Regions:
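Actinobacteria-biased recognition of intrinsically disordered, low-complexity terminal regions
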Residues: 1-15, 19, 23-26, 217-219, ...
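Active-site-proximal cofactor/substrate-binding loop regions of enzyme domains
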Residues: 5-76, 82-86, 90-91, 95
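Short, contiguous alpha-helical
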Residues: 27-67, 113-176, 235
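Conserved catalytic-core motifs characterized by acidic clusters
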Residues: 67-71, 107-113, 209-210, 215
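Hydrophobic alpha-helical segments and helix pairs
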Residues: 86-134
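A glycine-rich beta-turn/hairpin centered on an aromatic-Pro dipeptide
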Residues: 163-201
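Acidic/His-leaning functional-site neighborhoods
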Residues: 190-232
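C-terminal interaction segments
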Residues: 218-267
């Protein structure tokens, strides 16, 4: 799950997305419902993202696991702050400072296999964590998920986020994407239409096997059971269940099951 983006590009992505979170939180108000996160308000979103940033800082700082903050403790800290958006900004800036100060060969925990080195892996993870939740902040202001064209996201960053999801999160043993009893394995080809990136997912009763590559026929060739196509940003939003700008063709549709079963867990 090597990244094609630079460390500095991921850092810039964190800052860009955090600015989108703040601007939309100010516009919609902290009590506004988040259309893409049922049951959440913008305040919940800001507190969650602030907790994610602070948790990453604790890991990068090398604190023992028992000293990592819980979301509940950080939420209480944010609620006690004089201005929760200033508190959010402070956490984001601290994260960027810690990333910038970390040596390239930093040894630190990271929870996805075959990831880049920890410093790069955490910059990437926090970039996409912040970007996707910035889309949620936009959804709170708009009242529905934004289209790809309404976002600020660059296709290269979106393709990197798709890659992290499909090669990092989806193949985990805790993943829920499986065939059911007596159902034969199937392949899904995910192909971006505006950048030369493609991924083949082999789905069976075992953890998903993802192969990343390029080309119209995808990294493994052959005829897939399902083909998912869209722009890089459209795929990014759709695969994170923040949009529907993804076209599915093929004899064994699987997209509905993806939307039902694909959930992200950090542990």
């Amino acid at each position: 799950m090597a990244t094609t983006l630079s460390f500095s590009r991921h850092g810039a992505g964190i800052g860009d997305a955090a600015a989108v979170v703040r601007a939309n939180a100010v516009s919609s108000g902290l009590d506004a419902a988040v259309a893409t996160c049922p049951g959440w308000t913008v305040l919940d979103l800001v507190l969650h993202l602030g907790a994610a940033h602070r948790w990453a800082v604790a890991v990068l700082d090398g604190r023992p696991q028992e000293q990592w903050p819980t979301e509940a403790s950080v939420r209480a800290e944010g609620l006690a702050a004089g201005d929760v958006l200033d508190w959010f900004d402070d956490g984001m800036v601290h994260l960027l400072q810690v990333l910038a100060d970390a040596p390239a060969d930093l040894q630190a925990f990271f929870f996805l296999k075959d990831a880049p080195r920890p410093r790069e892996a955490w910059a990437r993870r926090q970039c996409h964590e912040t970007t996707i939740h910035a889309v949620d902040a936009m959804a709170a202001r708009l009242g529905s998920a934004p289209t790809a064209a309404q976002t600020w996201i660059h296709p290269e960053l979106a393709a990197d986020g798709v890659d992290e999801l499909l090669t990092g999160f989806v193949p985990r043993r805790t993943g829920r994407l499986r065939t059911v009893a007596e159902e034969p394995p199937l392949t899904v080809l995910v192909r971006a239409t505006d950048v030369d990136r493609a991924w083949t997912l082999r789905i069976s009763d075992q953890p998903v096997v993802t192969t990343a590559g390029t080309g119209e026929d995808g990294p493994t060739g052959g005829i897939p059971d399902a083909l998912w196509e869209g722009t890089a940003v459209g795929l990014y939003l759709a695969l994170w269940n923040r949009g529907d700008e993804l076209a599915e063709t093929g004899p064994r549709p699987f997209l509905e099951r993806w939307r039902r079963d694909q959930r992200i867990e950090w542990s």
